[in-house]
Design a protein with these regions (language model features):
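Conserved AMP-binding/adenylation subdomain of ANL enzymes
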Residues: 128-167
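Short hydrophobic alpha-helices that are characteristic scaffold elements of the AMP-binding
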Residues: 4-12, 32, 156, 167
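Structural core segment of the AMP-binding/adenylate-forming
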Residues: 9-82
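Structural motif detector for alpha-helix initiation sites
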Residues: 78-81, 101, 124
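Conserved sugar-transfer catalytic core signal across GT-A, GT-B, and GT-C glycosyltransferases
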Residues: 3, 106, 162
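Conserved AMP-binding A3 loop
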Residues: 105-131
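Conserved S/T- and glycine-rich ATP-binding loop of Class I adenylate-forming
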Residues: 7, 38, 104, 110-113, ...
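Conserved pre-ATP/AMP-binding loop-to-beta segment of ANL
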Residues: 88-109, 116, 141-147
Length: 167
């Protein structure tokens, strides 16, 4: 959730991926969307991606939540602790992004059960529309302090609605 919102506030487009993807699936997805930054949760996920990262010049930074022991691309690598210890420079502060409702917010890929995964672009307005409808439907179910429990990954479009509904 934090990464998703931070990327959107930086005027970026998020591309959540299933943790169950194989290296081949990740290679396809990365080639298709050509991200400049990849955020990885742990060493296990990093191991699935490290060969792909080394081969792609369009990947400028790799950010990990856990410190990775062996990294072949030190000039691209940042761990979350090193990012949070730095003071924000003026250029890092949030600016007016002039986003439109039809501006892309994220690309969600299908699970690829019928072939290669297909990327679907969700706009900021589309997410807002889903959120407004979901909040209206959920009104009778929500008390003063709702608790949400979901098993959906962020790479599922409904999870985007649920994560923002909590805010």
């Amino acid at each position: 959730l934090i990464s998703d919102i931070a990327i959107m506030l930086a005027n970026g487009i998020t591309v959540p991926a299933y943790t169950t993807y194989t290296e081949k699936d990740y290679k396809y997805l990365i080639e298709d969307c050509q991200p400049s930054v990849i955020i990885v949760s742990n060493d296990e996920m990093h191991n699935k991606l490290k060969n792909i990262i080394n081969e792609r010049s369009f990947i400028k930074k790799v950010i990990t939540f856990e410190k990775i022991k062996k990294v072949d691309y030190k000039n691209k690598y940042l761990d979350f602790d090193s990012i949070t210890k730095n003071d924000l420079q003026e250029s890092d502060k949030i600016k007016n992004l002039n986003l439109k409702r039809n501006s892309p917010a994220c690309i969600i890929y299908t699970s690829g059960t019928g072939g290669d995964p297909k990327g679907v672009i969700l706009s900021h307005g589309g997410i807002l529309n889903n959120l407004e409808g979901a909040c209206e439907i959920m009104k009778p179910l929500i008390d003063k302090r709702p608790i949400f429990l979901t098993w959906l990954p962020l790479s599922h479009s409904y999870e985007h609605t649920v994560q923002f509904a909590q805010i």
